[in-house]
Amino acid sequence: MTSKLPDWYSDVAKAGLPITLGIELLEVSGSRVVATMPVDERTRQPFGILHGGASIALAETVASFGAVASIDRERFVAVGQEINGNHIRPKLEGTVRAVGVPVHVGRTSQVWSIEITDEEGRLVCISRCTMAIVERR
């Protein structure tokens, strides 16, 4: 099977919040990002359901990697500027899957739409994330 992860991915995938939450990126490009996240003790809130903040962290991770995949990484960085999410259905256990696609790709910003679904394809959360594209200093 051919990897759907870019060559540069392994250099940036070794630390940070995605590792802590168990987020696994399956496909990364400037036109689509797919990732999964477990619903377990790391990602549930005290009442036993998927924490909304974990869903938002998954959504921003997807948007961030998509934005980074579409820019000149030598000259620019992509940083989260705004994110929102609507939590549609609770999730108690298992895995959620996020698919992100760009809605707008501009010179200084990108807007990504991310749908997070359960194993049956039912919508758990929908999010929109704006990424600022900033020149490296």
Residue ranges of predicted features:
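Terminal targeting signals and extreme-terminal segments of soluble enzymes
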Residues: 1-137
